[in-house]
């Protein structure tokens, strides 16, 4: 079986096609697939190490994380130094810095997506955010409890108009997906405001 032969004999993710084509009877597509699989496994391991030393802090950059990764036994004792050319200057086509930059872009994009998911999932933000956009002239009221001493009519619209952006953020502040952007509070608030503006009128 050609695929099994590749698994058993080709373990260098940067092996040249010329050195391996005799193993797969010239089937380049099969070889390329195997190479991508090997590189993917290495990158998955690197991602775990980057995440381990980043400790969920988006503001922690490569100047802090990369030295910690290079000193980590899990890195030193693996095939990763060879993969990124730290211990073997061969035909590698990447560096630890390049792999970190790609992962860093991914984690920021992922955190941003999760932030939006958090906003969509929050019933308080959704309900009051939509209500704030409703025409103030609409008579959308609910009757107060019969036992209320004032016996007044409580306007949902009036209540909604009193909620500012800080009130919305106070509900979100304990969510990990919100806290991860603590280093950019103004940008975070802008995202919340933009989301509220994007809501449709109920």
Can you describe what each PLM-predicted range is?
Residues 1-202:
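Structural signature for extended repeat/solenoid scaffolds and their inter-repeat hinge/linker regions
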